[in-house]
Amino acid sequence: MLQFLLGFTLGNVVGMYLAQNYDIPNLAKKLEEIKKDLDAKKKPPSA
């Protein structure tokens, strides 16, 4: 579990670093879509 969290955190940091240094709009959009998908999966549908 700890290893997963470390890898996940490291991945996020590297991703943010790359996004800041290389302005790639498509990649940013893709990351936002993935983030929204993860958030949707985390929360049970309240409808």
Curated annotation (Swiss-Prot):
InterPro entries tied to this protein: STMP1
GO biological process entries: innate immune response; mitochondrial cytochrome c oxidase assembly; mitochondrial respirasome assembly; mitochondrial respiratory chain complex III assembly; positive regulation of interleukin-1 beta production; positive regulation of NLRP3 inflammasome complex assembly
Protein location: Mitochondrion inner membrane; Mitochondrion outer membrane; Mitochondrion intermembrane space
Species of origin: Homo sapiens
Protein name: Short transmembrane mitochondrial protein 1
Tissues where the protein occurs: Expressed in monocytes and dendritic cells.
Transmembrane segments: 7-23
Family matches, as PANTHER family: SHORT TRANSMEMBRANE MITOCHONDRIAL PROTEIN 1
One family name in Pfam for this protein: DUF4535
Gene encoding the protein: STMP1
Lipid metabolism found in the keyword field: no
Physiological role: Microprotein involved in mitochondrial respiratory chain complex III (ubiquinol-cytochrome c oxidoreductase) and complex IV (mitochondrial cytochrome c oxidase complex) assembly. Required for the formation of mitochondrial supercomplexes (SCs). Also required for the activation of the NLRP3 inflammasome.
Family to which this protein belongs: Belongs to the STMP1 family.
Membrane topology term: Single-pass membrane protein
GO cellular component: mitochondrial inner membrane; mitochondrial intermembrane space; mitochondrial outer membrane; mitochondrion; respiratory chain complex
Subunit structure, as described in the record: Interacts with components of the ubiquinol-cytochrome c oxidoreductase (cytochrome b-c1 complex, complex III, CIII), such as UQCRC1/QCR1, UQCRC2/QCR2 and UQCR10/QCR9. Interacts with components of the cytochrome c oxidase (mitochondrial respiratory chain complex IV) complex, such as MT-CO2.
Transmembrane in keyword set: yes
Induction note: Down-regulated by bacterial lipopolysaccharide (LPS) in monocytes and dendritic cells.
Keyword line: Immunity, Innate immunity, Membrane, Mitochondrion, Mitochondrion inner membrane, Mitochondrion outer membrane, Transmembrane, Transmembrane helix
